[in-house]
Amino acid sequence: MIEDSGKRGNTMAERRQLFAEMRAQDLDRIRLSTYRTACKLRFVQKKCNLHLVDIWNVIEALRENALNNLDPNTELNVSRLEAVLSTIFYQLNKRMPTTHQIHVEQSISLLLNFLLAAFDPEGHGKISVFAVKMALATLCGGKIMDKLRYIFSMISDSSGVMVYGRYDQFLREVLKLPTAVFEGPSFGYTEQSARSCFSQQKKVTLNGFLDTLMSDPPPQCLVWLPLLHRLANVENVFHPVECSYCHSESMMGFRYRCQQCHNYQLCQDCFWRGHAGGSHSNQHQMKEYTSWKSPAKKLTNALSKSLSCASSREPLHPMFPDQPEKPLNLAHIVDTWPPRPVTSMNDTLFSHSVPSSGSPFITRSSPPKDSEVEQNKLLARAAPAFLKGKGIQYSLNVADRLADEHVLIGLYVNMLRNNPSCMLESSNRLDEEHRLIARYAARLAAESSSSQPPQQRSAPDISFTIDANKQQRQLIAELENKNREILQEIQRLRLEHEQASQPTPEKAQQNPTLLAELRLLRQRKDELEQRMSALQESRRELMVQLEGLMKLLKTQGAGSPRSSPSHTISRPIPMPIRSASACSTPTHTPQDSLTGVGGDVQEAFAQSSRRNLRNDLLVAADSITNTMSSLVKELNSEVGSETESNVDSEFARTQFEDLVPSPTSEKAFLAQIHARKPGYIHSGATTSTMRGDMVTEDADPYVQPEDENYENDSVRQLENELQMEEYLKQKLQDEAYQVSLQG
């Protein structure tokens, strides 16, 4: 009693230690229950060193402990279960190099306590054989397809069809593993678990079983099982990508990419714990990546796949025959090693992977000849005398096995190896044994020298042809799958390119580079608006000058042609300059730009207040250009008073025909222009008055050459101003177009 209580106390302490170490990993913070369950079971698997054991090692250990012959419902005590686990881990240490030896006793103790906690929570000290097989097959390492094939061999009948009762029992036992790591509310067993996976009206074979459990997504109750194997496969996968949340320079394991946010990628720890930054949300769809490919490699693969005209998508598993292969007849194997127990029906169903054509221990399929039957009978009758005194118990079953020469020769070799002195016992027996060997050798020589029948010669050729055709069909299927995957990859790359070339506002807000570019564009827009305002102010000043010139023309048309220029407008025409106030007020209406301009020009350039600034500026530029063109033509075409009608008709084609009359005489107009020369502007009032008094009819011959030069200068100046206005108009149109595009 004291020893039992001590063992029970040690067991509970080791269980608590295992679960305490699991809690120290902070796995409960994982947001998704599927990943949380898979991570916990992966921790138990690595802690117990079961990830170093594959399904084949488990099957071998079960056979060595004769569990394959037991009924699945048979219960094992703790000592028997500990013996099975000892076989597994001691054999593992033999396979491991000396530098990677494991602590066998600790692994056995941890795994034993975990199995007892999962399958014997009441503490009865017994676990069924079926539960042990399912637990070891689920938690061991290796490929998931091999595990599922072994599990199917345990829950199917002899015809290769799944039994629903056994599958329900399998779910009942295997779902105790998530419950043992405190994930029972998410993946506990329910009555509807089996019905949610398969329909009872449909026969489920091995291929259908593998298709369902290896599909994406798998059944809800077993969704953690494929994820457990994916975790093991990607533990050491390196991704040279920066995490968008924790900003780590690289990732290990899974990599997750958001399907809505541009270039938003998370490492597995940030994704599992629900971290999100910026505009990314946990509700966004994420894609899981188990490997990393550089852009160059992606392009190379896409091109190679597109050129191969086939799809790279491989099937989930190879196709297996619906009917299981018959087990090998082990009765005719030369058993020179220690005999092993014959496999049961359920274990022999797992022989799907055993190639029947490659085994050297297969019985002949052709019926024996009459002479061979008689010879075998003679050998069987001679067997008791042959085995007498050799330490072998003779019975009818042994006699049946001795019906083949291979077994007889094997026994003879063992006898000579174990007891060489038996050759001296009896000369009769030696002669009899030599005759048997000679007869067997002669028959083998005759069979090797004789030619094979045509059917037997063609059998290898037929099998080779069948294998070649099967390989060709598999290759065609693989190429077709690769072609489909290439097309999907090309479509995905095209969509990504289109999305990258047309960034959405949401993506622009998330990218700092795009935000900086947007700020620069807005700053450029403000500068252009200020430039536009300055140009508008300059244009207003030009229009003021034009108004003064038109008033001058009206005054000369109404007054005397010989009047003195001193009575005209004496202030100089201001040149267009960039106003400092215009830069300080970047936006104002077109009506404000016409302030201080006469009514004639305002009527010509007035626009509706509903139009935008760009249209107002374009209309004003056109009007000024037409007016300046008309004025230049007016100055060039005046040759006397008789040209007054031609000037009036020229101005009639413009919008200012009622405002700009022609001067009465060329000399009066020249006198007006002469009075506005810079030399007279900069002179004092006295000089201006004297020059005005001196301008008479008698002085015209002396003033006329200078007036003609100044007239030519004025014409050239107006032409230059016209060209400047054309240039400003074109530049204003270009800048307004750029502002409209950037806005």
Swiss-Prot record:
Domain of life: Eukaryota
PROSITE patterns cross-referenced by the UniProt entry: ZF_ZZ_1, ZF_ZZ_2
Region Interaction with MAGEE1: start-end pairs: 1-288
Pfam families, A to Z: EF-hand_2 (PF09068), EF-hand_3 (PF09069), ZZ (PF00569)
Location in or out of the cell: Cytoplasm; Synapse; Cell membrane
Any one of the GO BP annotations: chemical synaptic transmission
Keywords: Cardiomyopathy, Cell membrane, Coiled coil, Cytoplasm, Membrane, Metal-binding, Phosphoprotein, Synapse, Zinc, Zinc-finger
Subunit and partners: Interacts with dystrophin, utrophin and the syntrophins SNTA1, SNTB1, SNTB2, SNTG1 and SNTG2. Interacts with MAGEE1. Binds dystrobrevin binding protein 1. Interacts with CTNNAL1. The interaction is required for correct localization of both CTNNAL1 and DTNA.
Free-text note regarding domains: The coiled coil domain mediates the interaction with dystrophin, alpha-catulin and utrophin.
Protein name, as recorded: Dystrobrevin alpha
Originating organism: Homo sapiens (Human)
The encoding gene: DTNA
